[in-house]
Amino acid sequence: AEAIAAWQAGAAIVHIHVRDPQTGAPVTRLDLFAEVVERIREVSDVIINLTTSGFHLDDPQADEIRLQPLELAPDICSLDVGSLNFRGGVFHNSAEWVEAAAQRMREAGVKPEIEVFDLGHIRQATHLIDAGLIDDPPWMQLCLGIPWGIEASVGSLLEMQRRLPASARWSTLAPAASQLPMTTHAL
């Protein structure tokens, strides 16, 4: 319902995470993603961006589970490059998994939204582009102010922008009170 309301308010893209209907906890369940995608596609032409984050997964099959949303043929899927300390744990994105995920997205015809949380993540994304795993132009999401990633400041935003590949299309996000200042400066 929130994605459809956002589209009705003028959003061109919706980024989707799903939650357990009983507990409200973040989950990576293909059936829930499928239900959300179906409901959105029934009434709108909004661009659908499904997450592949899986930071909450504690499963030996997590790497494969994270890529299940590709089965739904979304327009876009997030591709988190690099690992990050996050919410009392580690948001693990090995170089091998990132490369495999980029390849799977390319084969599926899904545009990756390359989420970068620190400067080193831009280096890894550039490697993926140079290796032909991500088509040019790439779309980079500069994620600022996420705990233990790069701080949400104008200086950080400018430095991230400076290091992007020349052809990159980019956008930015930041949590809570940092969102408006970061998106304003991004314009």
Regions found by a protein language model. Name each.
Residues 55-75, 79, 83-88:
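Glycine/small-residue-rich loop that forms an oxyanion/phosphate-binding "nest" at active or ligand-binding sites
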Residues 8-13, 45, 74:
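A structural motif
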Residues 1, 24-32, 65, 89-97, ...:
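Alpha-helix N-cap and loop-to-helix initiation/capping positions
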